């Protein structure tokens, strides 16, 4: 008997490997993890996450590739600067219209899958794919817009935010299934459609590959080399790892950190150091603040290659997991998964009932406080400094890792995605 032909799945990814965008990583693992059930094609940009494009991707409009069994159609986009809004918009619109054209180059598709990136446009691409391919449409919402824009007062223009809401609700209504990544995000879908028919929605947690990020001894040569390079050896390292951007209230967190004076020691005699690993739109402001206030106990470290992430995460003793007020129900801090995978305690600043705070409280994986409650944040910080090196802190990290291995692995979540899509 001939082998049953696999159903065809088209993914609009925006970014895809080798780009390091977190959504690109998740979609790679999702696409590769579902190859046993689907014939997968990805439409995405040429590698360009940091703004530059290699010469090999500058000559054609489209590039066909295959990575680990996934078919890829890449769209050439212009280079951009993260600080230049016009170049950014031009870059995103080139992808959007390029992806619409690319849709005609991938043949018949049974399912179309799109994420909420770029904001609003990702959802609309999925609707376009559904119509052009007469396919079932799955809308994967990683973060809600305009809710995210409104939460941080990025735009108060009611015309713009109203149009964004109109179009994204349109994408939700046209979908056959919405998959989102937290209990609080499911609630947001319900809030959007109060009193009206709510589109079919399920929640599937994001994940991390637990075999790629895991606890490593502090004296591991690569962890030791990382610590030495950035002056962290023999220190108690409170780390923030990830995007240093708008949605994390980091400028105010710096004011809390300032209360811990350089030279402060933990109960077990180590000097306390705050390490920020990453980059983003707020980084320069934090650097200026550090210099002005002579905060010699704060270090800024550039993004690490994905292969080295395990060592940088393990160099932290405690990790910040923070969101600004208003982000509950809007997005889910994916950095939590890396912290839990490395088996580290969490210093969380997250709203009550947000997905990640629920997980941290359910597993007793760290200490939580509300965004904006700087006294409580300072108290929790003080607790970690006073309890450094004790079993209490170690056990928090161990519990987080155990829960992750049982419930938040790639295999568990990818299996759920495949099951939900095939039910349609």
Residue map of PLM features:
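Carbohydrate-associated surface elements
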Residues: 46, 184, 204-207
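Nucleotide-activated donor-binding/catalytic signature segment of Leloir-type glycosyltransferases, i.e.
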Residues: 264, 269-271, 277-278, 283-308
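Nucleotide-sugar-dependent
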Residues: 248, 298, 305-311, 319-340, ...
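A short helix/loop element that forms part of the nucleotide-sugar donor recognition site in Leloir-type
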Residues: 58-63, 214-231
